[in-house]
Amino acid sequence: MNSTGVFLASSISDFVHDAEAVVAALKANKSVQAQRIFLVGHSEGGYIAAKVAGQDRSIAGVVSLAGPAFAMDRILLDQMDALNILAGKSESERSTLSKANREIYRLMQDKRLSLDEVKARAVKVIDPLLPVFSPDKSTHETIRTQIMSQLTPNLRQLLSLDVAGTWSAVKCPVIGLVGEMDQQVVPS
């Protein structure tokens, strides 16, 4: 089976469809015991495994490695805070950046706004904070561009996922593992 997709243009929905296609191919393979298919996913792959297992009752189990267990905005806020701690940001700076991230995520989740409208409003949130990211003014345009480039349809879809609802639809056994020292998916 060969993929015809473009990875960088793919969304969570595309990855769910890919995983469903793999499960279908495994079930069609005579040498595979279809009732013993387990899905293993890392990070957002844990969500993808749960989504597939919640829709396909024949899945025998799910292993989620550092996969999401609650809303993606909370996970992303935790990730950013962990990175800001590693970057040596003060409590005040971290609080300011977290507040800005929450506002940007709120804008991204507002379905009434086009992505262009979100970006126009996000610039107004980001620009006053550029000195918190870096005191070096020569880096501000690069930082703004990096942040704005992440405001994509894929991020919008991630922020709209019903993670808890997806997991509650899973009826097979689940093993969820998160590393104690993980800075991307904070164990708490």
Predicted segments — roles?
Residues 183-188:
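Conserved alpha/beta-hydrolase "acid-adjacent" motif
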